[in-house]
Amino acid sequence: MGRYSGKTCRLLFMLVLTVAFFVAELVSGYLGNSIALLSDSFNMLSDLISLCVGLSAGYIARRPTRGFSATYGYARAEVVGALSNAVFLTALCFTIFVEAVLRLARPERIDDPELVLIVGVLGLLVNVVGLLIFQDCAAWFACCLRGRSRRLQQRQQLAEGCVPGAFGGPQGAEDPRRAADPTAPGSDSAVTLRGTSVERKREKGATVFANVAGDSFNTQNEPEDMMKKEKKSEALNIRGVLLHVMGDALGSVVVVITAIIFYVLPLKSEDPCNWQCYIDPSLTVLMVIIILSSAFPLIKETAAILLQMVPKGVNMEELMSKLSAVPGISSVHEVHIWELVSGKIIATLHIKYPKDRGYQDASTKIREIFHHAGIHNVTIQFENVDLKEPLEQKDLLLLCNSPCISKGCAKQLCCPPGALPLAHVNGCAEHNGGPSLDTYGSDGLSRRDAREVAIEVSLDSCLSDHGQSLNKTQEDQCYVNRTHF
């Protein structure tokens, strides 16, 4: 369709309609003295702003390149756009609610119900068109997800040599040359190979890196199961725009109902206001409540993503228990799990592991645990520990091997020493306010003894037995021997 895609053309068409009806409803609301029509016109304005924000955020988020200024790209632009739309709509609803309450205290009649009815019906039609357009966009987004899943499955089958008609099977038996040469002209597999050549080139580097890191793709060769287990990725940006359109549609319904009542049961100018005058503000308050009930969950979800909170559906306690039960792991700390965007979860963690054992097997098992939890972007930092050291030295199991080299930057750490989150340690028990590691089994990996403790360790007399603070000289000398979790 030339410069713009079909979806962009539909959105631009919706923008034009929204601008036109915003002006029409604003003028008609003042002429007809209808608070519902005025509120609906400002809902149209919010739709216009949300469309601009949604289009801009979607364009920014689709930028394919990552640079030194945006190492994660611009994927969160849609999250910011959705949050902006939801917050703006909430503020608008508050303004409308205040105006409706004032109208309840001083009710007024609708002067020209016929004009209000005509404009309200036309506005409702525009909103229905908008709902159909954005529902189509949401369906297009879901279709893209399903298409990606099918392409993953086709590439996996192609790698295993089990694509029908490409490396054997009934179609291959009909033409041996095509079976021998899957890239022969006219063969079905030739189209598949050409269609996926670019994507296979992009995945080549990741495949080599994963093989070097010791990952096993045999445990992740079921894309359909993977798509079912991971959290469903929703288009937050589209949800924000849909929320505005839905609110505007509800406002149009209120306008139509109020106008019909005044048109069927007109009030003369000399008659006092009766129950009819309360219909308009009452339905407006109900509309505000319905819109806010949909806006608050979107605000909560987008704010949780921007605050990098643990995603909903991730059981941290169960995950930590499984990680600490992996053979060879002495302790797990510095665990951070957050969402880049809805459905894309990222995890980082530090692992204490024996220095005389290779960590490839443990890395594979850890990634399997995260994979089954729906987390596929995992960064693991292994830290060596010598289990042959005396028991009094095993407090080192609780220490991070990579603290900052300077005490002055302690407050700049994501988890400063004063804030002690929970860590999992195999064979660790809490003793006198601090952990003790004298309860190891024969292999040091007894899962029954594993406990979740808040860790504050003392090393080389950095802290007294009663937790008394030290003077500045002693604290400076032993800072390099303490850390945070």
Swiss-Prot record:
The record marks N43 as: Important for coupling of manganese to calcium transport. Signal peptide: none annotated. Residues 1-10, 62-81, 135-244, 300-485 are cytoplasmic. Changing N127A: No effect on localization to the plasma membrane. No effect on localization to the plasma membrane and decreased calcium:manganese antiporter activity. One of its GO terms (biological process) is zinc ion transmembrane transport. One of its GO terms (molecular function) is zinc ion transmembrane transporter activity. Calcium:manganese antiporter of the plasma membrane mediating the efflux of intracellular manganese coupled to an active extracellular calcium exchange. Required for intracellular manganese homeostasis, an essential cation for the function of several enzymes, including some crucially important for the metabolism of neurotransmitters and other neuronal metabolic pathways. Manganese can also be cytotoxic and induce oxidative stress, mitochondrial dysfunction and apoptosis. Forms homodimers. Forms heterodimers and high-molecular weight oligomers with SLC30A3, SLC30A2 and SLC30A4; heterodimerization is mediated by covalent-bound tyrosine residues, occurs probably in a tissue-specific manner and could mediate the intracellular zinc transport activity into early endosomes and recycling endosomes. This is Calcium/manganese antiporter SLC30A10. It comes from Homo sapiens. The lineage of its organism: Eukaryota, Metazoa, Chordata, Craniata, Vertebrata.
